[in-house]
Amino acid sequence: MKKTWKQKIVSSLLAATLAVSLAPIGQAKADSPQTTIETPSITKQVDANRAIEHVRFLSETIGPRPGGTQSEKWASRYVGMKLKSMGYEVEYQPFAVPDQYVGFIESPLSKSRNWQVGAAPNSLISAEAVTAPLIFVPNGTKLDEIPNEVNGKIVLFERGATVADYNKQVENAVAKGAKGVLLYSLIGSRGNYGQTFNPRLTKKQSIPVFGLAYAQGNAFKEELAKKGNTILSLKARHESNLQSLNVIAKKKPKNSTGNEKAVIVSSHYDSVAGAPGANDNASGTGLVLELARAFQNVETDKEIRFIAFGSEEMGLIGSEYYVDNLSQKERDRILGVFNADMVATNYDKAKNLYAMTPDGSTNLVTDATLNAAKQLNNDLVLQGKFGSSDHVPFAYAGIPAALFIWMGVDSWNPLIYHIEKVYHTPQDNIRENISPERMKMALDVIGTGVSDVLQKPAVQSEQKAA
């Protein structure tokens, strides 16, 4: 019997959990009287290919993971089960997130590409398919630019330059009898290819209106040019009363009093709609899981936490919720946060691994990783100023934190930088956007930095953090 999508995931989860190695890694000697140890070099313990297998599961088996959706929940369970199988105490921290409006396109191309898209909230949202031939119309902001042939068809437009422009495209298509409208974006906000989006309509429409990524819209244009026609089926879903989850794993020192200093290694595991999110940010999550494996049997005088945040792409919701719910005493316990986001791209212009803070200042985390880079004779690791990830809420709460990301920076003032063109798109997949060498370097540098902080006596680490 053919397995359903959910059954395949559950089977894979169970198989993956049962396959976890129980071999001790970097374990302290039983007769050691000290609370800190000399751990073997982290570089010999971490494996980029093993981390990328987590990336593969998240980005291919599960796929796009918009915040609060079922696919994000599957991802949280995968991460939690992996961490629990390593012996960590695992907690799922729920929090509310905004509604999601997700569109789905079935076509002859559906098997080769991802066709999850954004749906306009005030367009037709229906599980019943709207099926019709596709027609491409250039421009369309003027009614006389819309041919009568659009009647009864689904219209594909290059998205107008402004919200007002694409609203005119939609209204003109409706006036000519279109059964659906697909708007595809050409360029993203950071020089990347256009990503999926939820069109903001000024008028309620009785037909489906979807926002597509450039790769999706361009594929349809090519299909029409090659075959002359293609039939699409459009469905949409409004998901409400949503909850996302932070996955929090802890390993306390022996004879813990509950007041020990803590070190956090974090990432977010969600993605935007329509994007498999291999680099953004299954790569960070794969790194977190691989470092958790490497540190699972290491004994120190500190608590170590591995946290996978939900719904980062919706506005850092998971990390903000986590920090907001920490007492001042809990905040004071945290020595530093090593946050991994987009750590394995193969994009050649993203040539440096940066340790970024929101204000550009250095702290215990940046110092530890820059020192680690020196130990490893790695001159590609630099320090810089950047927000837009889960290190920000910690930094604003006075907790030393840094973002680790591959980027190319031409200028800091004004800020001119390079990230991969396939960021937030259906092309953010392992084949097109993941480098094992970049993943290994991130594992080595971040892992060595974490190890150095863990090995330092707590008092010395406190002084460094102050």
What are these language model-derived features?
Residues 117-144, 198-278, 293, 297, ...:
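Soluble metallo-hydrolase cores and metallopeptidase-like ectodomains found primarily
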Residues 44-49, 53-154:
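Noncatalytic luminal/extracellular "stalk/propeptide" segments of secretory-pathway proteins
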Residues 299-300, 309-408, 412-413:
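Metal-dependent peptidase/peptidase-like ectodomains
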Residues 35-37, 48-63, 82-89, 154-160, ...:
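Catalytic-core environment of secreted peptidases
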Residues 413-466:
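His/Asp/Glu-rich mid-to-C-terminal helical/loop segments that flank catalytic regions of hydrolases
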Residues 20-35:
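Sec-dependent signal peptide cleavage junction
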Residues 33-70, 86, 93-95, 100, ...:
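N-terminal capping segment at the start of a domain
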Residues 69, 115-208, 380:
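Extracellular/luminal Protease-associated
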